[in-house]
């Protein structure tokens, strides 16, 4: 849909129980409907929700009507000719009258079925001032489509969108380009065929001249053998040159492939070496089962009881769900060891330096215990990835 070019604004008011065509004029233009909204002023006192339906003529049926019309025209011509040739004798009036009544009833039922099959009906949406006021849509209607809208309920529904230009409208240019391409290709193929035919004619004519100069039958046979060998030699030379060319291409491609593979191998080795050279995080088990894992070692003095520290952190549950974080703005500041935070933080942050990064896994008794908080169930083990950014 993004390829369509908007030309102008489209709007249509569909009043209750009044079928309204999507296009009121015969200009061949495509429309794209993107929004439906309800008018809060009711048409009656029932104040029922309004349902928008789209009614579309069945394209298969219209195509069938076209063929049926041609067949009916042919039948009418045959009937007129048969009437001119001879009058049909009258038969039993009673039996004919009964058959006519049955036939008319069956035709009426068939007409009703055809009317039902002629149109396709589909519910698009239902809106009400008490609930939903509007609904986004994305419906494109081509100019050749016979489409109507009808509303059942107590409120008018307004449709809005754009008149758009379809990308396939400029197909004539591409057709001309294709014709030019094929005409050029045919002409080039024709020239190549003519050149090959001229070469063959020259070879045949030269061979004929040589044979005319020979009188003896044995000379002719020997000359024919020479021509055949000469032709085979040419073919073999062509094959050899082609094979040599392919071998040269393969050899030239091999160094490039080797270079690519060596570069990839070197990169993989560097990544592997860098990963292996990285020191593994040090894990320690502290009081109450608290686990700390130093990811980055900071510089300067270590945090201790009474030190005011500024922290960045991301708090996660055991299933990996993030329940709290401080990654930008003002850092979270508290005094270490004074009970301003959960006990797991007072124990887990101690010993860090500025710039240090650490993972702290805190069992439930050293976090919030049996207390349930928003986003944190009771008896939850918490994991914090923390970074010490300031210390006083």
From Swiss-Prot:
Cite the GO molecular-function annotations of the record: macrolide binding; peptidyl-prolyl cis-trans isomerase activity
Per UniProt, the ranges with Basic and acidic residues bias are 220-234, 252-279
Can you say where in the cell this protein is located? Nucleus
The enzyme class is isomerase
UniProtKB keywords: Chaperone, Isomerase, Nucleus, Phosphoprotein, Rotamase
GO biological process terms, semicolon-separated: epigenetic regulation of gene expression; maintenance of rDNA; nucleosome assembly
Q: Which residues get modified to Phosphoserine? A: 80, 82
What EC identifiers does the entry list? 5.2.1.8
Reply yes or no: does the keyword Transcription regulation apply: no
Q: Tell me the segments the record calls region Disordered.
A: 58-116, 161-284
Q: Which cysteines are joined by disulfide bonds?
A: none
Cross-referenced InterPro entries: NPL, PPIase_dom_sf, PPIase_FKBP_dom, PPIase_Fpr3/Fpr4-like
User: Which reaction is catalysed here?
Assistant: [protein]-peptidylproline (omega=180) = [protein]-peptidylproline (omega=0)
This protein's GO cellular component annotations are:
chromatin; nucleolus; nucleus
- In what residue span(s) does the PPIase FKBP-type domain sit? 306-392
Q: Compositional bias of type Acidic residues: which residue ranges?
A: 73-86, 104-116, 172-219
Could you share any additional remarks the record makes about this protein? Answer: Present with 14100 molecules/cell in log phase SD medium.
> What does the subunit section of this Swiss-Prot or TrEMBL entry state?
Binds to histones H3 and H4. Interacts with NOP53.
**Official protein name in the record:** FK506-binding protein 4
- The gene it comes from is FPR4
């Amino acid at each position: 849909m993004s390829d369509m070019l908007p030309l102008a604004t489209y709007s249509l008011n569909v009043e209750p129980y009044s079928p309204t065509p999507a296009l009121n004029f015969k200009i061949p233009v495509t429309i794209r409907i993107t929004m439906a909204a309800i008018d809060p002023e009711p048409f009656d006192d029932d104040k029922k929700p309004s349902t928008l339906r789209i009614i579309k003529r069945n394209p298969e049926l219209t195509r069938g009507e076209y063929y049926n019309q041609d067949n009916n025209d042919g039948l009418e011509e045959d009937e007129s000719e048969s009437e001119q040739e001879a009058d049909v004798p009258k038969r039993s009036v009673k039996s004919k009258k009964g058959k006519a009544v049955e036939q008319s009833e069956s035709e009426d039922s068939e007409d009703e079925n055809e009317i039902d099959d002629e149109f396709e009906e589909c519910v698009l949406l239902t809106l009400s001032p008490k609930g939903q006021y509007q609904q986004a849509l994305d419906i494109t209607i081509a100019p050749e489509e016979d489409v109507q809208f009808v509303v059942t309920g107590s409120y008018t529904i307004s449709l809005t969108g754009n008149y758009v230009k379809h990308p396939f409208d400029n197909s004539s240019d591409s057709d001309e380009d294709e014709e030019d391409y094929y005409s050029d290709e045919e002409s080039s193929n024709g020239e190549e065929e003519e050149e090959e035919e001229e070469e063959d004619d020259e070879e045949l004519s030269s061979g004929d001249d040589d044979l005319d100069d020979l009188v003896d039958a044995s000379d002719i046979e020997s000359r024919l053998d020479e021509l055949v060998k000469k032709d085979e030699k040419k073919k073999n030379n062509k094959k050899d040159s082609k094979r040599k060319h392919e071998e040269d291409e393969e050899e030239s491609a091999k160094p490039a492939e080797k270079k690519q593979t060596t570069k990839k191998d070197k990169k993989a080795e560097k990544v592997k070496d860098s990963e292996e050279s990285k020191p593994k995080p040090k894990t320690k088990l502290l009081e109450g089962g608290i686990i700390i894992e130093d990811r980055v070692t900071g510089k300067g003095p270590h945090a201790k009881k009474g030190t005011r520290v500024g922290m960045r952190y991301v708090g996660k549950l055991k299933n990996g769900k993030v329940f709290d974080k401080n990654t930008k703005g003002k850092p979270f500041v508290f005094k270490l060891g004074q009970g301003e935070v959960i006990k797991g933080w007072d124990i887990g942050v101690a010993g860090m330096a500025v710039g240090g990064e650490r993972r702290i896994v805190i069992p439930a008794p050293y976090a919030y215990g049996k207390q349930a908080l928003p986003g944190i169930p009771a008896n939850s083990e918490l994991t914090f990835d923390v970074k010490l950014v300031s210390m006083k």
